[in-house]
């Protein structure tokens, strides 16, 4: 005759076993425990596969981050190269020549060495994009600086009114808008608050807008070309 008390205790033990779930803090612990447990090999292999995939995913994430950093770096440099190609460089250097020279690794390393953002973050090896962008913007501010652009723009401003007086009515509006942008550049350069770095973006934008329409042929005296501003 069975003892109800013993059977009840056994049932409670079985229920306790079936309801108890292991709480593993680490996937490596789970991996070790699976090796010790007597479970079907198919299940064990599947769990091992999941653990390995998890570990590989971590490594893949780091690799993807590195690739993303490299892509961002290339995009940033390419964007700055495009700006240089649009604006041209100092001393009459053609814009396309300047941008292509950026693709020379040796020159690029010289430009970016020391504080110019080739340094890596000590923790994750990521490119310091803030420092890199600051370095490239510094170069941009030199190309669009008062020392390079002010005199040729003043020459254009001085001769523009006479040209507009004799210009065809169909062409006047476009040239007047161009003239206003030239004046705006000069106003920025002559302002007591002018700052080459701070104002580089607006000067760059204005010069690009000026170049959207070819400069009047009678006003071209090579001064803009000498400053590195293509006249189209």
Swiss-Prot record:
Region listing for Disordered, in residue ranges: 1-71
Q: Name one GO molecular function term.
A: peroxisome membrane targeting sequence binding
Q: Which residues fall in a compositionally biased region of kind Acidic residues?
A: 25-38
Which domain of life does the UniProt lineage start with?
Eukaryota
Compositional bias per record (Basic and acidic residues), positions renumbered to this chain: 44-71
The record ties this protein, via InterPro entries, to:
Pex19 (IPR006708), Pex19_C_sf (IPR038322)
Q: Which GO terms describe its biological process?
A: protein import into peroxisome membrane; protein targeting to peroxisome
Listed under GO cellular component are:
cytosol; peroxisomal membrane
Q: Which Pfam families match?
A: Pex19 (PF04614)
PANTHER family according to UniProt? PEROXISOMAL BIOGENESIS FACTOR 19
- This protein is called Uncharacterized protein C17C9.14
Species assigned in the record: Schizosaccharomyces pombe (strain 972 / ATCC 24843)
């Amino acid at each position: 005759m069975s003892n109800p008390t013993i059977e009840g205790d056994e049932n409670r033990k079985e229920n306790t076993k079936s309801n108890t779930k292991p709480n593993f803090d680490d996937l490596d612990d789970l991996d070790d425990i699976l090796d010790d447990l007597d479970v079907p090999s198919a299940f064990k292999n599947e769990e091992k596969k999941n653990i390995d995939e998890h570990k590989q995913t971590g490594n893949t994430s780091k690799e993807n981050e590195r690739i993303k950093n490299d892509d961002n770096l290339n995009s940033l440099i390419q964007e700055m190269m495009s700006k240089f190609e649009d604006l041209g460089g100092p001393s009459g250097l053609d814009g396309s020549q300047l941008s292509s020279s950026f693709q020379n690794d040796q020159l690029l390393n010289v430009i970016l060495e020391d504080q110019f953002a080739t340094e890596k973050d000590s923790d994750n090896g990521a490119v310091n994009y803030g420092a890199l962008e600051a370095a490239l913007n510094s170069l941009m501010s030199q190309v669009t600086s008062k020392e390079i652009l002010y005199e040729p723009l003043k020459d254009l401003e001085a001769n523009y009114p006479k040209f507009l007086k004799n210009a065809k009515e169909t062409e006047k509006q476009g040239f007047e808008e161009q003239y206003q942008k030239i004046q705006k550049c000069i106003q920025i350069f002559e302002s007591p608050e002018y700052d080459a770095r701070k104002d580089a973006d607006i000067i760059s934008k204005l010069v690009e807008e000026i170049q959207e329409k070819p400069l009047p042929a009678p006003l071209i005296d090579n001064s803009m070309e000498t400053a590195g501003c293509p006249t189209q």
